[in-house]
């Protein structure tokens, strides 16, 4: 089962930029999300920041070239990540 963070908070948003905080998440989610975000046409930058492992001041940023809204790019990236994780889960359990 895939769980979602307990709290997702949009810290900043324009058409071309979105900065989102995912409470309780770490490099595990952010690295995968960053790699997938770069596969979406129109994404110029995808990055994350974790201030300190013991603090919950972390966030993810997507910046686009204007051909796609940053919010839409983030949603697409999250959907692609979910799909890849479900495919991996199916592959894993079928090969045990």
Swiss-Prot record:
One GO CC term, this protein: DNA-directed RNA polymerase complex
Catalyzed reactions: RNA(n) + a ribonucleoside 5'-triphosphate = RNA(n+1) + diphosphate
Key words of the record: Cytoplasm, DNA-directed RNA polymerase, Nucleotidyltransferase, Transcription, Transferase
N-terminal signal peptide: none
Protein location: Cytoplasm
Xref: InterPro entries: RBP11-like (IPR036603), RBP11-like_dimer (IPR009025), RNA_pol_Rpb11_13-16kDa_CS (IPR008193), Rpo11-like (IPR022905)
Keyword Cytoplasm: yes
GO biological process terms, semicolon-separated: DNA-templated transcription
Molecular function GO terms recorded: DNA binding; DNA-directed RNA polymerase activity; protein dimerization activity
Cysteine disulfide partners in this protein: none
Pfam families: RNA_pol_L_2
EC number: 2.7.7.6
Group of enzyme by EC: transferase
Protein family according to the UniProt entry: Belongs to the archaeal Rpo11/eukaryotic RPB11/RPC19 RNA polymerase subunit family.
Chain's role: DNA-dependent RNA polymerase (RNAP) catalyzes the transcription of DNA into RNA using the four ribonucleoside triphosphates as substrates.
UniProt-listed HAMAP family: RNApol_arch_Rpo11
PANTHER family on file: DNA-DIRECTED RNA POLYMERASE I,II,III, DNA-DIRECTED RNA POLYMERASES I AND III SUBUNIT RPAC2
Subunit structure: Part of the RNA polymerase complex.
Protein name: DNA-directed RNA polymerase subunit Rpo11
Chain's gene name: rpo11
